Every structure is written in structure tokens, then in C-alpha cells.
Amino acid sequence: MDARLNPSRRRLLTAAAVAPVLAGTAPGTAAAAAARRQRVLPVPTAEADWSRVADVLGRSGTVEDGAVYRVRFARQDLPVTTYGVTLFLGSYAAFTRYDDGHTLVMGSLAVTEPELQPAIDALNTGGLELSAVHKHLLAHEPAMWWTHFHGHAEDPAALARSVKAALAATTTPSTPPAASQPRTDLDTAAIEHELNARGVNDSGIHRFTFNRRETITDHGRVLPPATGMTTLISFYPVGARRAAVNGDFAMTAGEVQNVLAALRRGGINVVELHNHGLTEEPRLFFAHFWAIDDGVILARALRAALDATNTTPAG
């Protein structure tokens, strides 16, 4: 080939050589931009906006993240004992309204083994999709299972009726327990220092929530943290400043092994590793844990596991 090409000829050849590279990258970039544009966003709501849902469920919830109406269903009828510690568990449903006029509900039901299949049948009949079935605890009595679900519709009250029907398959009390804030002997200030986060006293249980830093989506719908995309840590006081800790870490696939290793190095038992949803992006996995020890020592071990995740304290 003659190397003595005129400038215009050189420009044509350069453009021809670069074009395949650009052609290979532009669609991916365009697809990512299109996906961002197609995200369906939650809309801000207040508790008054959810009055029909509250009427159906027979109780009020609270608005979290400015958009998620979260309703809790305590199983105060069902004290659960594990390793000598009595826990009072519960279910929840989180409703989120979107700018396309649809409402999404996500949540989980805490059910006994005899209640499990009737609850699953009720979810199916009500048009709610089952996304996970598993345990959250090691050996415990009575045997408990957790069923995660989600669904969406234009009418939030219809979703609430489906949730209520599933709850009716259990002996979950129809009214919430009376509010209480029993005193605790945990050194909560030192625990918060170790975790570098503020906790909340929830009926004597000191709880911490950590949000994922990424934007989590499901079929294009942006999922606020309060829909369940969080790490939750609960400290149950057992006396002498000792605590039973349980909860779950929300992790991407690349974080799982480091989190599990950190938990075990800290003497914390790994209970379960599983999903809660089916189609969220990025894909999340949840590791449930359990331990009993001095509360501050446990907090230090949990901090090491938190450091392996891309999370930040809620609030």
C-alpha cells in the first residue's frame, strides 16, 4: 500500500477503522441510558394517602423513605424460643405507589409449619407472587417459616385484601399490641459507637438498619430501602449487658463470602443464605445470623461484616 496518502484519505481510513469499535460500544451505552430513562419511580406519599389500605387491614402503618407505607403484624400470640431466648416475631407488608399509577406490595409472613401451606394457597389465590420460603432461626420452638411475597396492581386496596386473606390463614392477632418501651441494660451507646450508627428502641429491642448504596430496581421499578432492601440487626437484651443478636445482611454476590467469613471470625453463627426476591437488580442475597454474647463484643464483630458491604446507616 502506498504510504503517501493525502490527509483526506487518511481521515477516511481512520474513520473506517474506528467505526466498528464505536458500533460495538454505542448500543450498550445507549441501552444503559434507555434503562435509566425507563425506570419507574416511587411517588411521595403521606399516611392519609393510605387510608383505604389501613381500613382493609384494620390497622395503621407508617410512611418510611417518604414513599413506603409499611404495616407490621406482630405475632404476640406466638412466643418463639431459641437457645433459651424468647422472641416475638412478626410479618410485614410494604406498599409503594409509582408514577405509572400502580402500587407495589412486598413483604413477608412469619408462620408456623401448620400455617405455611394455607398461607401459600391464600397468597396464590390473591394474585400475590411467592418469592422465597425459608427459616430465619436455628433450632427453635414452635417451628417457624417465612414466606416472602410481592405483587402490583392499580388498586392498593385490592393488594391489601390479598394480604389480609393470607394473614387470615394464620392466627396472627387482628389488632396490634400495646406500645411499650421496656428498659434495657444493654450498653447501647457503646454498641452504637462500634457500629457507627444510631439504633432505635423497638419494644426493648435495639435495632439497626443499613441501606444499600446502589439503586435497586425490579422490572424497572425503583425499590426504596423500606421495601426490604436493607441489612437489619437486632439486639435482644438477655441480662448482664449480654445480648442475643439476629437479623440479616443484604449483599450482592461479590460480597457474600467476605461477609460470611467475617461473621464466623467474630463467633457469630450463620443461619441461612438465600434470596428474598426473584428479579431485583442488582441481585441481592441475604445472610441470617445468630449469637449470644456481650453486646459490645457482638457489635464489633458485626461491624467487620458490615465493612464488607456497600451499605450506609439508615436515616
What would you call each of these model-derived segments?
Residues 1-7, 18-21:
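N-terminal secretory signal peptides
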Residues 41-44, 75-76, 108-115, 181-182, ...:
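Short, surface-exposed ligand-recognition loops at beta-strand->loop->(often short) alpha-helix junctions
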Residues 96-106, 236-246, 308-315:
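Structural motif
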Residues 6-7, 26-52:
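C-terminal segment of N-terminal export signals and the immediately downstream linker at the start
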Residues 87, 113-138, 253-276:
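Extended intrinsically disordered, low-complexity coil regions enriched in Ser, Thr, Gly, Ala
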